Every structure is written in structure tokens, then in C-alpha cells.
UniProtKB/Swiss-Prot annotation:
Cellular component GO terms, alphabetical: cytoplasm
Keyword presence, Transferase: yes
Provenance organism: Salmonella typhi
Binding residues for Mg(2+): D51, D91, D227
Protein name: Selenide, water dikinase
InterPro entries: PurM-like_C_dom, PurM-like_C_sf, PurM-like_N, PurM-like_N_sf, SelD_I, SPS/SelD
Residues given in the record as ATP binding sites: K20, T48, R49, D50, D68, D91, G139, H140, S141
BP-aspect Gene Ontology terms: selenocysteine biosynthetic process
Lineage: Bacteria, Pseudomonadati, Pseudomonadota, Gammaproteobacteria, Enterobacterales
Amino acid sequence: MSKQAIRLTQYSHGAGCGCKISPKVLETILHSEQAKFVDPNLLVGNETRDDAAVYDLGNGTSIISTTDFFMPIVDNPFDFGRIAATNAISDIFAMGGKPIMAIAILGWPINTLSPDIAREVTEGGRFACRQAGIALAGGHSIDAPEPIFGLAVTGVVPTERVKKNSTAQAGCKLFLTKPLGIGVLTTAEKKSLLKPEHQGLATEVMCRMNVAGAAFANIDGVKAMTDVTGFGLLGHLSEMCQGAGVQAMLCYQDIPKLPGVEEYIALGAVPGGTERNFASYGHLMGDMSREVRSLLCDPQTSGGLLLAVTPDAEDDVKATAAEFGIELTAIGELVEARGGRAMVEIR
């Protein structure tokens, strides 16, 4: 089979971050008394489902460690590798850090797909690493029934600048650096519903580095930060709210969306991960239409940064975003938690 005829997405049952195990099932897997390990230098572990682990070296610098890998979300091998690597590196930026090194994770059906295609995937990953200014320094590979690619990434951050997903405050404005709808558009493409003018839009967004995260971390008024990936905006925002004991009020019209996303939702281009996310987080939502629900629960692959920002730092955040070519609009705010109100409400 020629490389041009290969459709990588046909060789896997899941796609991108949409193939994550659902939060409900993951809770069952991770629930263990042995998971509790006390180390005063471990600043961020698994307790708040943050983007990466952070370890204090005791000299003013902390190490960030993360891993992320998934099955193809696009058919082009190079783009698949680039997206997977960009997505993995994003976790370092989401913690406010700077990546310093990556190693590759590759699972490949060697009797089904040519090693040449795997090389293209790896080259895409290497390209993303070069964009981030780091080496793809090694890795590990296995013969697997479905193609899988990703990275384990190491980063560094000044300890006082670590940005967690659990330290937001009531009164903070919420900002999102990329539009939602990646899961919808990639599903529309798999179903041959995607219009010519929307071809490549999702890939362009997924390949966009969240490098601004390290700059946002230098702003004192950025109280919390995370990236929006497989659990959708609802899932990652809920984790931010739960960790800080606050509630979120979102303005649907202000949430950035990829062109055509509402039309494709109406046509049924909704990935399976959306329903899994709703099953895990839907009870935290206020009343909303199926269309709104489908967007907020849409699994993002290499999605944007979600920031909780104090009002006095809003101008600094917008100016920093502009330096990186990001146009920011507040999508909502955090308020004091009150009983009888949903954790995430839409207006």
C-alpha cells in the first residue's frame, strides 16, 4: 500500500486525546491506599489530576515530568507525530515551565504498517521538539496492534512560579488560548462531512505550541493554569473548580469555537469521548442544550491553556498573549462556591 493511500485513523479504535480512559474508570484504576506516598519535595502529584508531576530540587528550581501518547487523530503520519509531541510538551508549559528534553513512546503494528511510516511519525515528533528548543533524546518502542505515539517530557521551572490547576480564586476571570471543537472537526473529517474550507483547521490549531505558558507564569495574577485536552473544557474546568473550592460562570457566546463546529454537531459529528466526559462530569453542569453540552465536553487534542486571572492582571495577560499572537477574551469568571448551584453554569 502506498504512503498516499494510508489513512492512519483507520488503524485505531480511538483518536488523539479522545481515546483517554474515562475519568470515572480512571478513578477506579487509581484508587489505592498504596497511592499515598508522602514526599515533601513532591509539590504536585496525582491528587488534583494536574498536568504533570513537579519535584522541588531544593535550590529554587523544580523538575517537571510528564508523559502523553495516543492513537492517530489525523491520517498524515508527519502531522500525527507533530501533534502528539506538541500535545505532550504542552503539559510542561501548562505548569509554567520550560521543556528541556523529551524521549519518544512508539507502539507500531510492524506487520501491518511500514516502518517507513513510523519514521515519518517520529520525524513529526522531532520537528515539534525542535520547535520547542529541545532534543528528542531517545525513547522506547514496541510491536503493538494499533499505532501509538507520544513523548515523555522533562522540564524545569522556578519553584515560586509553578502554576497548578488547583490554586484559582473566586473573582478570577477565565481565559482560553485556543478555540474549542477539535474533536468535532476531526470526527466530521472521519465521517467525510468536513467542508473544503474547513480542511486543515483542526491540524493547524493542534500544532500550535502553548509556549506562552512560561510567560504567563511570570505574572503574579495568573493564579491557576491548565491545558484543555481529552476531558474537554468542562472536565478540566471542573478539576480547577474542585481543587480551589469555587464555581464557574461561563458565557457561551464568548467561548472561542472553530469555524463550522455548531453545524457539525447538528450533523452528528460528535466523538465518543464527548459522552464519556459527560457521564463523568455532567452532574456538575447547570441546565444547557445538547449543542452546548457537546461543545463543552468535546475532547480536545493539544488544546489551549485555561487561565484563572485576577482582574488587576487582565491587561498584563492580554499583552503577553498578544506578544505570542494570541487574541484573548474572557470566557467567564470564578465565584464563591454556594450550595444548590452547579459547579459550572452557562449564561
